[in-house]
Amino acid sequence: MKNRSNENPYFTRLQNMEKTRRWLLEQRARKAVEALKKNAFDALYVTGLESARAEILNRIPEGAKVGVGGSMTIRQLGVLDTLEKQGHVIYDHWRPGLPEGDILKIRKAHLTCDVFLTSTNAVTLEGELVNTDGIGNRAGAMIFGPGRVIVVAGVNKVVDDRESAFRRIKEIATPQVVRDMGLELPCAVTGFCVDCNSPMRACRVAVILERKPFLSDIHVLIVGEDLGF
């Protein structure tokens, strides 16, 4: 058998390229975690999905009513089925076939649930959570109301600062989210934000959590995987 490393002088470096990339993302994530802690958030870095699931389940008390924000990240983790099997009431407004009136009730229930599960659009290296919403139930529930908030973000959502956070939201997250939702918006067609004034514009509420709000119990898990939009 031929030794491929003899054929290509960069073979080893090419093999290590993804490992090196992951190392850098982990360093950035860990720096963000330390900054979040300084800003009074409970924050933790975990390496993968299995560890993230375990941390989430360990932080949800027995019998807790659990609200779920509009988050692909939370669905990727696969914890909702487990929580239902454990007997938790789940407030999930993404359940197929829900009447519009029920969806509104569930969104309101997010504000008073025992535990609210969500992601965030961006986490800065300065320890801030940056979000843009269309309705505001997700951003609102992150700030005040639930007994506990668990925020989960992949390393792909770690950015340098607020400016980078909003640029990520406008240029990366929102075009994908609205296209996935099937909304007829300019960014869903072109992939670029034009700061539209469409009746269905998704960017209507912008919230920055600079520090953990008083009376709120917020846990932030940064996962060493690409998650969500």
List each language-model region with its residue ranges.
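Catalytic cofactor-binding cores of redox enzymes
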Residues: 10-11, 60, 145-146
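N-terminal active-site beta-alpha-beta segment that forms phosphate/nucleotide-binding
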Residues: 25-107, 112-117
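Flexible, glycine/proline-enriched loop segments at strand-loop-helix junctions
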Residues: 19-20, 94-96, 149-156
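N-terminal start-of-chain detector that recognizes signal peptides
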Residues: 14-18, 37-40, 88-91, 102-104, ...
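Conserved phosphate- and dinucleotide-binding cores of soluble alpha/beta proteins
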Residues: 111-229
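Charged, low-complexity, helix-prone segments enriched in Lys/Glu/Asp/Gln
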Residues: 14-28, 103-113, 174-177, 207
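Unusually extended, aromatic-enriched hydrophobic runs near protein termini
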Residues: 1, 25-32, 77-78, 84-89, ...
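Generic N-terminal amphipathic, Lys/Arg-enriched alpha-helix
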Residues: 2-42
